[in-house]
Amino acid sequence: MNKISEISIQSQKTENLVKFNANDDLPKSLFEQKEPHFQAIFDSILSERASKRLSTHKVKNRAEVSGTGKKPWKQKSTGKARAGSKRSPIFVGGGRAFGPTTQRNYNLKVNKKVKKLAFISALSQLAQNQQILVNDFSMNKISTKLLVDQLKIFKIDQLRHILIASSDPNLFLSARNLPNVELVKTNSLTVESLIKADLLIISKNEITNLEKRI
């Protein structure tokens, strides 16, 4: 796996953040790691990005390229090297040998313990910086305006990246038109989304689900 110095993980964060002291509501097993493990975070983010990569690029091999199947010239007595098909990669217009295919797998293996260490490190950083708000942001109906009003109550509507861990469908539909709000189910939280977040909003029930995930 690459060293952490070989890549920079850029994220624009908001200055002068509103602080929330939620340490009393946070379990120590998830949010009280004293020293963040940056190499584990780096490796996990690389793996998360690689797993999203799709092998959509492709070229035609000799079986797929158009052309005759006739033997170009007879086997012997021409002085030329023997050839069996014009679609061979050695001819102009022939198929590509060893080209990119849609079957390529870009996934990078990261050990489970390293993933867990990275996830807890990211959560602990948010807790230490007082960037976690324990609150049930459930919505009775789909309304972006009501959600914005709720964010204004906590004076967090101007933050660049608000991460909400919730499974509420009304909340998801209300937040999808807000560029600075990202709503993710607890079992889909990634290390990269936690690192980029200015604020994590999570309910006590979702914290329990988070403990089960770890």
UniProtKB/Swiss-Prot annotation:
- Oligomeric form and interacting partners: Part of the 50S ribosomal subunit.
Q: What is this protein called?
A: Large ribosomal subunit protein uL4
A cellular component term, taken from the record's GO annotations: ribosome
Q: Positions of the region Disordered?
A: 56-86
Entry keywords, A to Z: Ribonucleoprotein, Ribosomal protein, RNA-binding, rRNA-binding
Q: Belongs to which family?
A: Belongs to the universal ribosomal protein uL4 family.
The UniProt entry's GO biological process terms, in alphabetical order, are: translation
Q: Which species?
A: Mesomycoplasma hyopneumoniae (strain 7448) (Mycoplasma hyopneumoniae)
One matching Pfam family is: Ribosomal_L4
Enumerate the PANTHER family for this protein.
Answer: 50S RIBOSOMAL PROTEIN L4, LARGE RIBOSOMAL SUBUNIT PROTEIN UL4M
Locate the compositionally biased regions of type Basic residues.
71-85
* NCBIfam families to which the protein is assigned, alphabetical: rplD_bact
* InterPro entries attached to this UniProt entry: Ribosomal_uL4, Ribosomal_uL4-like, Ribosomal_uL4_dom_sf
Q: What role does this protein play?
A: One of the primary rRNA binding proteins, this protein initially binds near the 5'-end of the 23S rRNA. It is important during the early stages of 50S assembly. It makes multiple contacts with different domains of the 23S rRNA in the assembled 50S subunit and ribosome. Forms part of the polypeptide exit tunnel.
Provide any one GO MF term from the record: structural constituent of ribosome
